[in-house]
Amino acid sequence: MAISTFSIGDLGYLRNFLQNECNWFRICKKTFYREYRSVATSSPTFSLNNKPKKFCMHCEIVIFKRSEEFMFSLAVNGIHFGQFLTGKMKFNKKAVPEGLYYYILELGSITPIDLGFIPRYNSDCVTNMRCVTPEVIYENCSIVCPEEANRLTVKGSGDNKLTPLGGCGAWCLKNGGDLYIYTFALAYDLFLTCYDKSTFPSLAKIIFDMIACESEDCVFCKDHNKHVSQAGQIVGCVSNQETCFCYTSCKKKMANINNPELISLLCDQEINKIDIMYPKIKASLSLDINSYAHGYFGDDPYALKCVNWIPVRISAALSRLIVLSCPVCKRVVMD
């Protein structure tokens, strides 16, 4: 791409995308250059000029240092995109557990340049990061105490406003440059003894699996296959990795239960409907799942079992990996 094709607006969108929508994994570190890659979901603001929209954006950066400045070449989806100069470039390391870490890019203003050559991008290189599993999420979350919950707002204005992620009882807090997912998780002993170990048992996931419709054409209840690998191992779109929080069924009010096998995790009584509820007046985060969902048998209401569920806050490093791997969560958080 020629230098002249980049407007000031283009450069601003590109800089924002590289900093705020990409999780970077280091591919190589050499004396004269370094290379990083990111596998990102489609962006609401940044796109490739004159190219069909892609739901996965595989970005590769090769960086060279010159005096007090940095020069970098960028490729997107295997195609050289451009070369740029900046006075500030910093990769901040974020560690989740042992074996899973990534970098967040900090950039100064960027200017198009021409290095006179296009470096070879290591497009086939695969990261060896540990996957995001339910165990990893349990290891990297904290129980939310009543004092913390009272400081968080689920309805109305406030400094600590939670953004709903789509699923029942799942939110994200933007705190400075950090993201924190808040959700209700199945008690760990129940997860170990009676639940699928490949799926993180959030309240959002359990309720979704109970009430999702069976239509193959439903855009809500069927996997949209537009996630990306949270740890960057796979280039291209993947199915929901069962560790996301975007689960939203086509029906939320008095929805019929189509999968009764999970009822015992929510209620001791027999129920055949779930009613998902949303606060109508200003409210802080409630630690009672009955504030967000209720069970019914016909028209008779039944309270859900709070004892099976723990309110948790997922670490900032892990929350960012999860949110940015999902186009739905990323968009609602960035809006």
Curated annotation (Swiss-Prot):
GO cellular component: host cell cytoplasm; host cell nucleus; viral tegument
Compartment annotation: Virion tegument; Host cytoplasm; Host nucleus
Keywords: Host cytoplasm, Host nucleus, Late protein, Virion, Virion tegument
Pfam families membership: Herpes_UL16 (PF03044)
Disulfide feature: none
Function of the molecule: Plays a critical role in cytoplasmic virus egress. Participates in the final step of tegumentation and envelope acquisition within the host cytoplasm by directly interacting with the capsid. Upon virion binding to target cell, a signaling cascade is triggered to disrupt the interaction with the capsid, thereby preparing capsid uncoating.
SUBUNIT field: Interacts with cytoplasmic envelopment protein 3 and with the capsid.
Protein name: Cytoplasmic envelopment protein 2
Native source organism of the sequence: Human herpesvirus 6A (strain Uganda-1102)
